[in-house]
Regions:
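Patatin-like phospholipase
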Residues: 1-321
Length: 321
């Protein structure tokens, strides 16, 4: 977790005055005079620093060593092709895994590299699309959660019998809506935050419900189980944060670089109710460390359940006191 604990926004996207000002000017010009200039901005921010960060952290030899040792059976990342509209799963495995194809979804065996990681994390409008070669042609890709109707599918196709889901949407608790910050007409940042949440979070919840439904059917009717067709019981454990990420982000919005705050302020992105949108840009150590601490607390609170799921039994060293 060390890289995350010490991460700053300028290691993910450009935050200097000249770059951010130019980006804001391009968007303003495009909206006001785009019909005259014919130029359109690529994204709100330039994430060139993220490429440098990933190149420094990505170790192909270490990945191969994990495959060789049997510690990892497969790795997959997903991305949406803006070029064709298809959702693509790029996967790498030392085992024979036949690629799969569904409506608007395909899987491609490839050696996972920095370009795939950038494509999978290119948040729409915020970061630019990434070119990746597919079937001999360059296609432009964005964040893999877009149009991801079945986010558990890659793990299932790659042979998983148990899936640990680490989500970002907090578990709903009593008084949930009493803590919603702000009221009145929604700001653009508030609308954008909800729109991105619908893209990134809703598909996962629906897919988990589908998997649980299939599990119930297989349990009631064991004769329908067929691993070749995917009809098998697959255990799933969902780890969701006990606190709302946007409320944590609201406490740290002012830690964003001044240039970024200046760009977000007219959109309402520096207000508490716009914190969900700001959280996608909030790569600052105070925020990331609080998320790490939250994850550790939540994992420890469920450590017996987690250990039983991962190991089948609870190791003595992990039992709750």
């Amino acid at each position: 977790v060390q890289p995350w604990a010490s991460l700053h926004a300028d290691r993910v996207y450009r935050t200097d005055v000249s770059r951010v000002s130019a980006s804001g000017a391009r968007w303003l010009t495009a909206m006001a005079f785009g019909w005259m200039t014919g130029h359109t901005p690529r994204a709100l921010f330039d994430n060139a620093p993220l490429r440098e960060l990933l190149q420094a952290q990505h170790d192909a030899q270490q990945l191969q060593a994990a495959f060789d040792a049997g510690a990892l059976r497969a790795l997959a990342v997903t991305a949406l092709s803006y070029t064709t509209g298809r959702h693509v799963t790029f996967y790498q495995s030392p085992h024979i895994v036949l690629p799969w194809k569904r409506s608007q979804r395909i899987a491609v065996a490839d050696e996972i590299g920095v370009s795939h990681l950038l494509a999978s994390s290119s948040i729409p409008f915020i970061f630019p699309a990434q070119a990746v070669q597919l079937e001999g042609n360059d296609e432009w890709f964005g964040d893999g959660t877009m149009r991801q109707m079945s986010p558990l599918s890659p793990a299932i196709h790659l042979g998983a019998t148990r899936i640990l889901v680490v989500g970002a949407a907090a578990r709903q608790q009593p008084g949930w809506y009493d803590t919603v910050p702000g009221s009145g007409y929604p700001t653009l940042a508030q609308v954008a935050g909800q729109a991105l949440a619908s893209v990134f979070l809703d598909g996962l919840s629906a897919d988990i419900e589908r998997l649980q439904h299939v599990n119930a059917m297989v349990s009631r009717n064991p004769e329908i189980a067929d691993a070749r067709d995917g009809w098998r019981k697959i255990e799933v454990l969902v780890m969701a944060p006990s606190e709302r990420i946007e409320l944590i982000a609201a406490r740290h919005v002012q830690r964003l670089p001044r240039t970024v705050r200046a760009l977000l302020r007219p959109l309402g992105g520096t207000e508490a109710r716009g914190a969900a949108f700001a959280s996608y840009l909030l790569f600052e150590p105070e925020f990331t460390q609080e998320l790490i601490d939250l994850g550790e607390r939540d994992a420890m609170a469920r450590r017996d359940e987690l250990a039983a799921f991962l190991y089948g039994v609870i190791p003595d060293t992990m039992r709750a006191a």
